A protein has these predicted regions:
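Residue-identity detector for threonine
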Residues: 14, 29, 121-124
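Extracytoplasmic
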Residues: 13-15, 54-56, 98, 165-167
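Residues that form or immediately flank small-molecule/cofactor binding pockets and catalytic motifs
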Residues: 25, 106-108, 175
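Periplasmic OmpA-like peptidoglycan-binding domain that tethers envelope proteins to the cell wall
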Residues: 66-170
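N-terminal targeting leaders that direct proteins to extracytoplasmic destinations
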Residues: 1-8, 164-171, 175-176
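Periplasmic peptidoglycan-binding/anchoring modules of Gram-negative envelope and division proteins
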Residues: 2-11, 20, 25-67, 87-90
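Soluble periplasmic/extracytoplasmic beta-strand elements of cell-envelope proteins
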Residues: 17-21, 58-62, 102-104, 167-173
Length: 176
């Protein structure tokens, strides 16, 4: 005979770049590429819902912000955006999933910023090292943001890198 091990728990995730107006949390399907991103997320939800061998334990929705602005305000903004996306998607999930939609917050996505800066091909090596030094030795995110704002590369970072930090992650926790 042959033994097959089936894991009881399963996990899947995806990330969407959902645009929000500055300082706002409303889901606007007409803003940026939101319509196609939200459609992609809805398709992902449909695909997971169609997996008859799995049941959903939770779908955790976590919105993250870029570092500009006070950390405390970004915490509130992240929570408000996560909740707005949860409410929006509530109309598109199976009825039995509605209570399984959870929200989480990531006020400022410094880990992703570190990756983006490390992999950037526009900024010079010296600038990258200085920026990474600020990020990696950060004790207070608001102080770190003020230090970054003093660098000549800050405008580039705000225009090209920071928008990539404003994302929403979807974690599907499932079981057999």
């Amino acid at each position: 005979y042959r033994m097959i091990v089936l894991e009881r728990r399963a996990y899947d995730n995806t990330k969407a770049l959902i645009d929000f107006a500055q300082g706002r949390s409303e889901v606007d399907t007409a803003l940026g590429d939101n319509a196609s991103e939200l459609l992609r997320i809805r398709k992902c939800i449909e695909d997971v819902a169609s997996l008859s061998q799995f049941a959903l334990d939770s779908l955790v929705i976590m919105a993250s912000c870029s570092p500009e602005g006070a950390y405390s305000l970004n915490r509130r903004l992240s929570a408000d955006r996560s909740e707005a996306v949860r409410k929006y998607l509530g109309d598109f999930v199976p009825e039995e999933w509605k209570d399984s939609l959870k929200v989480s917050v990531l006020p400022e996505n410094w880990e992703q910023l570190e990756k983006l800066v490390s992999n950037d091909t526009v900024m010079t090596g010296d600038a990258v090292r200085k920026i990474l030094d600020v990020i990696r030795n950060m004790k207070d995110p608001d102080v770190a943001e003020r230090k970054l704002a003093g660098f000549p590369e800050y405008r580039y970072m705000r225009e090209k890198l920071y928008p990539k930090l404003r994302s929403v992650k979807f974690d599907f926790h499932l079981h057999r």
